[in-house]
């Protein structure tokens, strides 16, 4: 298996200074599973001691893949309609995260995969995260069918980053473009199998702007 990750030339009118543009590629000599993503933590306030609770999150997804109490996907694809998983309109991350809802209990908050409506269209944002405090907006684009949103539920103030900064509980958000979790055991889902002669190509763009 040969794998590479590189920033390709800027696409879709984006400049190097306003976007992180990642492309993963892989080829193999034996059938294997490939499902790469980026687990960066985004804090749009520049202050890791602050919670992400007021960040506005939008996800272009009508459904998600629920998890059980062990964080394993159940194999279902469930509508977000009428649930705390509905982010089709801008909603504060913290507005419902502690609600008495089974999925939020299982994930200790948001740590789930959403089934994207973008259907591989990299010119259309699949998710948007915005800080009302700074006006910084992060748009995410991908050719993948899913995105995992992790709200930093297990950040507990014990991790120290650069310049001695402590990362507090839910101080940031991860937006991870991907195939759905556990796809090798869910043959009806988009496959993560890579066979000899095939090429894996996964594209993720994080584009930043400031709302005026």
What are these regions (language model features)?
Residues 1-212:
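An exposed, glycine/acidic-rich loop-and-rim segment of catalytic or binding clefts
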């Amino acid at each position: 298996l040969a794998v590479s990750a590189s920033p390709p030339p800027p696409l879709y009118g984006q400049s190097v200074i306003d976007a992180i543009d990642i492309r993963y590629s892989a080829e193999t000599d034996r059938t294997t599973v490939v499902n790469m993503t980026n687990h960066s933590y985004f804090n749009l306030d520049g202050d890791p001691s602050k919670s992400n609770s007021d960040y506005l999150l939008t996800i272009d997804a009508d459904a998600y893949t629920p998890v059980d109490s062990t964080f394993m996907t159940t194999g279902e694809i469930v509508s977000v309609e009428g649930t705390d998983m509905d982010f089709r309109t801008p909603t504060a991350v913290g507005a419902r995260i502690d609600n008495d809802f089974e999925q939020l209990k299982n994930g200790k908050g948001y740590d789930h995969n959403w089934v994207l409506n973008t259907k591989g269209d990299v010119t259309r944002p699949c998710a948007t995260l915005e800080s009302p405090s700074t006006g910084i907006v992060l748009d995410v684009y991908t050719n993948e069918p899913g995105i995992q949103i992790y709200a930093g539920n297990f950040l507990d103030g014990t991790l120290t980053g650069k310049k001695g900064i402590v990362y507090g509980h839910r101080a940031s958000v991860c937006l991870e473009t991907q195939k759905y979790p556990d796809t090798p055991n869910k043959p009806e889902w988009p496959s993560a199998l890579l066979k000899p002669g095939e090429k894996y190509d996964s594209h993720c763009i994080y584009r930043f702007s400031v709302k005026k």
